[in-house]
Each structure stands twice: as C-alpha cells, then as structure tokens.
Amino acid sequence: MKTHVDVLIAGAGISGIAAAYYLQKDCPDRSFAILEARDTIGGTWSLFRYPGIRSDSDMYTFGYSFYPWQQPQAMAPGPAILEYLDGAVEEFGIADKIRFGTRVERMSFSTADSLWTVRTRDVATGRTHEYTCNFFWGCMGYYRYDAGYTPEFEGIERFEGPIVHPQLWDDDIDYADKRVIVIGSGATAVTLVPAMSDTAAHIIMLQRSPSYILSVPQDDPIDRVLKRLLGEKRSFPLIRRKHILFSTMLYQFAQRFPERAKRFYIGGVRKALGPGFDIEKHFRPSYAPWDQRLCMVPDGDLFEAIRLGKVSMVTDHIDSFTERGIALRSGEELE
C-alpha cells in the first residue's frame, strides 16, 4: 500500500531540516515526510569524523536565520554543529516526520496525475515501499556517503602504509609520531592538517596548485561586544547581517579589483608566515580570487603549524606511489 504526502523531502541534514521548518511555518496545512537513509540526522556533520572537522563558513550565516547560533566560535567544530541541528529538530518538532533507514531507489513522475511515485528500500530489512507526493524536495547534498571520490594514482597498490580517505575516517586510526602526507589544499585539507599537526611527527601538505587562504578570527571582537550589549537573542540578527555583509564585500571587492584582492590575500599569508617562506610557489594561485572557493582558517591555525615546523608545503604533481611514499614529477620522493 502506497503512502501519500503532499511533500516528500530526501535527506535529514542541514538542508532537509530547514525545508521541514519552512513547510511547517508557511504551509501548515500540507503533509510531509523526510526520508533519511542513515540512522541519524545531520548529513555531513554526523558522517565526517576526521580530526578538526569544522565548518569552513561562519555559523552565523551557514546556520539558520530562524534558530540563532549562540556558541562563541564562528567557525564551529563538527560535534557542535551536530548538537545545533539536534536542537533545531527538537525545538520545532521535526523528529516525528523523519523516516530513518529509508533509502530512495527510484522515482517516476505522472504528468496525467501530477504525482511523483518514489520507491524506497528499508536499509535494515531490504523491504521496499512506495510513496506518492505532489512535490519532491531533494536535500541530499552532493556527497556519495558510502564512498568518497578517490583519484587514480599510478602504483598506489605498492604503498606499504595505510591510505585513508577523510570521508571514511575511523576513530581507531593512529597517526601519533608518524610522518603523514595530506594530498590537497582545499577546505578539508586546511582543516585536517592543523588538527593533526600536534600529534603527528610531521605532516607534508602536497598540492598540485595553491589555494587562496584567509585567516579569520574565531571569536570576533565585534560579535562579542554586540552580545554583551544586546544579549544573545537580540544581537543575533545584527551579527548575522554583519557576517553576510563582510562575505559579500570580500566577494565584490575580488570581482571588481582582482589584482588588489590578490595582493590583499597573499599579503596576509606573507604577514602570517614571515620572511624566508616561498609564498610565490605555495600560496599564489594561477586564478583570480573567488574564481574558486576561498579557504578560511580560524586564527591562522594552518599558518602557525607551518611556522612552527610541524607542517611542510610541497607544490608539485604526483608521478606515482612507491613502497615508502610518493614520487613527484620533479624527481623528488616524499616519504
């Protein structure tokens, strides 16, 4: 027997929870359900467990306008974000709308009936079920949760040590006092590397090409003053608008004056790392700022790890894996 709802939401992560809130608020007469393949809410924030997992945008804008972020850290650690999402689900009575362990397998649309038919499978039992709905709202994100993307590297099977994908991080992984190579310099890498640097013997951050990286304050003094003067609840709309304005100005500045923006970003790295570091090789991208995402690091934690000698930067192309490390096109081998 089919189950009919007006709106079917796929995914109980940050987007799916927001969709449910607005449906309840703006369309209280409409029925809906949330299908979630896993056994918990949170999506990315309950799946990813690698060291240092955090938001790479401030939570005042990344979080909900209808549920104020009240932690002091703007760029929050993963567990704090998951706690925040749990709080939103409880606050707005969304939990009873979620069908956990339910994976969407197939969808079809009937023009004659103006209905979607959605076939699902119970992850635990394998049983199938069909839903019908007038609107299907996809809030699944863009990750394949069971297997992250892994490039093909020549000779990778020869490497004798463990190879770990951050998306599939296991809490039992022991990297204490070991040399680690982290491939990439995007948002995941700039989060992972500083968090591992206090425990690992040394980390090499291997990138094919540089990224723009900006240090931002973790505990913004302006936010702190507004909270003290107005309180958490009344200050939140102002703090949110301030962060939106700051991000918009950064973007617009980069679009209108790309060369000046480039000097600003690279100048910040030069100031953080001091003289003697090859900024041009490792931190000057070939593209203009905001042609790709800007990576932000709270309180310059990545730069501090580099400055203290815990992390080395290598900019080169991978030729192949070896038994003990990675051979680069330049002829150098990293172990």
Mark where each language-model region is.
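Core beta-strand elements of the Rossmann-like FAD/NAD(P) dinucleotide-binding domain
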Residues: 3-5, 124-135, 175-176, 330-335
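A conserved short coil-to-beta-strand element within the FAD-binding core of flavoproteins
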Residues: 100-115, 311-329
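Beta1-alpha1 glycine-rich phosphate/pyrophosphate-binding loop at the start
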Residues: 5-9, 14-98, 207-208, 271-273, ...
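Short hydrophobic core segments
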Residues: 10, 130-143, 180-183, 318, ...
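Rossmann-like dinucleotide-binding core of oxidoreductases
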Residues: 2-4, 8-10, 14, 18-34, ...
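Short beta-strand to alpha-helix junction loop
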Residues: 69-87, 99, 183, 253-262, ...
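Feature captures the FAD/FMN-dependent oxidoreductase FAD-binding
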Residues: 72-144
